[in-house]
Amino acid sequence: MAWKWIKAFVYLSVCVTSALGDDEEASASKCADFNNTTWLEYRQATKLQVQYLLLTRKNANCASLFTQDCLNHTQKHTAYFNSSLPTKVIVHGYRALGSKPSWVSGLAQALLREEDVNVLVVDWVYGASFAYNLVVENYKEVAVQISVLINQLTKYGSTLESFHFIGVSLGAHVSGFVGTLFHGKLGRITGLDPAGPMFKSADPFDRLDSSDALFVEAIHTDSDYFGISIPVGHVDFFLNGGMDQAGCARSRFASMYGYVICDHMRALHVYMSALNGSCPLIGFPCSGYEEFLAGKCITCDDPFNGTCPQIGLLKNSGITATPLPNQEKVYLLTTASGPFCAHHILVELNVSRLDKTAEVQLILKSIGHPETELNLKLYTDETRYKTVAAHPEQLCKIDSMQLINTGGRFYRQGDIHFEYICISEIPQTRGMDPLCVKNIHIGRGVPWSHDFVQVC
């Protein structure tokens, strides 16, 4: 299935080249830029070409080409690299048409705003383009070349622990193999939807794995197509179950690019949003997504000692438990568009026993924000229900709640009596009590609503 999607992506990319990135030449200044390649150049290439672009707060808007000559200070702009600072290494993945990735600048700028660091961007477009199976054959050689540079940097004062690799798709496995070459002594690796095709059944030695760095995290958003479905880090964030992201409906053909790659690239965009500090994006440990949605995993007590892991740059994703967990799956919900901030609202209902199955719609409203709609099915043999929903605002900013008895399609649905409905935000914090309404009676097609008066 994934191979079919890769072929479709290559075909559709021909139609949407402009959407893949800015292909304009670098300005007349001496700013370095990504390589671009064509099919003819790719066929004629005799060896893999890798180059490195350096960005720091001193040259945040004008990347410099970084080579081993830089380490000998034979180039004027080499003073930008500061071995006493941490170094973020960005590694892109598969490039279908040989174009530079359009997102690199945004990610680098977000990292520099957050911390005073060196940002090294690995440009291996020449080896990452066109035939995916051949690209996979190249990834270890790319990792070897990167490791040579890292080894040189350690001789000039950098430490292995100071390196944080951020790999997108196939770039996650490149980063992982660099970590393997350094026996897991790199400081951190972040895999943004690590590639799945040709890696799902691979040995841990040949893919990203928790042994590749002191701390490895991964964000999964397309595990049923381009991304890997298994946990590969100390902690693995599965956004919206790790597949079928909100706002990436496959039924729409308005954007062919979005149709093919939207889910896969959501990990990157959510990560960048987390760096921009829009809101805390925290995950809950759970055995599965359905169990999480059913409200069975509402704390982070085990194995995180009550501190939920958070996407971003906190040390070890905010995990304070020792030893670190391994391949721990955590789940979280997001909204359909940036900044993807979602507050996890636990909805608990107690219903008087029914004669027939029933269907209701629950709507949570916050002024100035999209509504949250939940469609719930109620059964004759159950009276208590729990579910988790994503809402764009915190609990204390929910202004009203509405219930609609939507009825059955092929039979007349009777009235429904709710003993109570409670909504609360998870993880629960001190001073944030649940909002509860008792003794609710709704007839078919007659909306019921309740307004909350709150001040955050």
UniProtKB/Swiss-Prot annotation:
Q: Name one GO biological process term.
A: lipid catabolic process
Catalytic activity annotation: 1-(9Z-octadecenoyl)-sn-glycero-3-phospho-L-serine + H2O = sn-glycero-3-phospho-L-serine + (9Z)-octadecenoate + H(+); 1,2-di-(9Z)-octadecenoyl-sn-glycero-3-phospho-L-serine + H2O = 2-(9Z-octadecenoyl)-sn-glycero-3-phospho-L-serine + (9Z)-octadecenoate + H(+); 1-hexadecanoyl-2-(5Z,8Z,11Z,14Z-eicosatetraenoyl)-sn-glycero-3-phospho-L-serine + H2O = 2-(5Z,8Z,11Z,14Z)-eicosatetraenoyl-sn-glycero-3-phospho-L-serine + hexadecanoate + H(+)
What does it do? Hydrolyzes the ester bond at the sn-1 position of glycerophospholipids and produces 2-acyl lysophospholipids. Hydrolyzes phosphatidylserine (PS) in the form of liposomes and 1-acyl-2 lysophosphatidylserine (lyso-PS), but not triolein, phosphatidylcholine (PC), phosphatidylethanolamine (PE), phosphatidic acid (PA) or phosphatidylinositol (PI).
Query: What is one GO cellular-component annotation here?
Result: extracellular space
Protein localization: Secreted
Cross-referenced InterPro entries: AB_hydrolase_fold, Lipase, Lipase_LIPH, Lipase_N, TAG_lipase
What is the protein's species of origin? Danio rerio (Zebrafish)
> What keywords is this UniProt entry annotated with?
Disulfide bond, Glycoprotein, Hydrolase, Lipid degradation, Lipid metabolism, Secreted, Signal
Which segments cross the bilayer? none
**Which CDD domains does the entry mention?**
Pancreat_lipase_like
Q: Which cysteines are joined by disulfide bonds?
A: C248-C262, C286-C297, C300-C308
Q: Name one GO molecular function term.
A: phospholipase A1 activity
The record's annotation in PANTHER family points to: LIPASE, PHOSPHOLIPASE A1 MEMBER A
Recorded protein name is Phospholipase A1 member A
Q: What is its EC number?
A: 3.1.1.-
The active site annotation covers: S169, D193, H264
